[in-house]
Amino acid sequence: MIEGLQEMLKRDFNITFKDVDLLDAAFTHASYVNETPERKKKLKYYERIEFLGDAVMQLCVSEYIYEHYPEMPEGKMSRLRAAMVRADSFSKFAIECHFNEYIRLGKGEEKGNARQRPSLLCDIFESFIGALYLDQGKDEVVRFISKVIFPKLELGWFDHMMDNKTELQEVLQQNGECKIKYNEVNVTGPDNERVYTMNVVVNNEVMGEGTGRTKKAAEQMAAYQALKKLRK
């Protein structure tokens, strides 16, 4: 199983671990160790590495938000980071990376379909990040999540957790009823790489404009720009 994991990481992410035992531990569940008594003293499992991976993800995501959203208020930065490092987000990333296929489980956990359990998938994703950090450092972690996670911001992947449109509506309605409308301003790029520009109009006044890979993502950015304008 570890050989298949190494091949996948090299093929899909150009990652080659120097310490293969560390990678092995990152994908080993305690149930597997407990059911292998003759190797119990030698085998390690992921929980301590996961602890480190959680902290590394918090740092890397915080740095990315700080650098790429220089005018975002601290409160919104915290909400965005929370959305990006949620357990359900990590479990989806793990499946997207096919990590669930390489977890070493005990027979009982395997029968219980633990391989698809969101909490375990979240743990494995964090454990992989911790192992990658120990093996190759923070820069390699950033390179990996720049491929797996950060592009999802442009695609509006976290919109349901960071709803600028709803926040804008709530802020505006504090001062009474108002008419909010989102309009398509421009569309560029080929069919498979569309970039949309949308604006938000409040009582016939353009309050913000944003771009994104989907109309919904562009609308969220337009709402964010409108919120910035209102806070000035």
From Swiss-Prot:
Its main location: cytoplasm. InterPro entries: dsRBD_dom, RNase_III, RNase_III_dom, RNase_III_sf. GO terms for cellular component: cytoplasm. It is an enzyme of class 3 (hydrolase). It is found in: Cytoplasm. Residues 163-232 form the DRBM domain. Pfam families: dsrm (PF00035), Ribonucleas_3_3 (PF14622). It comes from Ligilactobacillus salivarius (strain UCC118) (Lactobacillus salivarius). Homodimer. Its cofactor is Mg(2+). The active site is at D54, E126. This is Ribonuclease 3. Belongs to the ribonuclease III family. SUPFAM superfamilies: dsRNA-binding domain-like, RNase III domain-like. Digests double-stranded RNA. Involved in the processing of primary rRNA transcript to yield the immediate precursors to the large and small rRNAs (23S and 16S). Processes some mRNAs, and tRNAs when they are encoded in the rRNA operon. Processes pre-crRNA and tracrRNA of type II CRISPR loci if present in the organism. Gene3D superfamilies: 3.30.160.20, Ribonuclease III domain. Its EC number is 3.1.26.3. GO terms for biological process: mRNA processing; regulation of gene expression; rRNA processing; tRNA processing. Keywords: Cytoplasm, Endonuclease, Hydrolase, Magnesium, Metal-binding, mRNA processing, Nuclease, RNA-binding, rRNA processing, rRNA-binding, tRNA processing. Mg(2+) binds at E50, D123, E126. Residues 6-137 form the RNase III domain. One of its GO terms (molecular function) is ribonuclease III activity. It catalyses: Endonucleolytic cleavage to 5'-phosphomonoester.
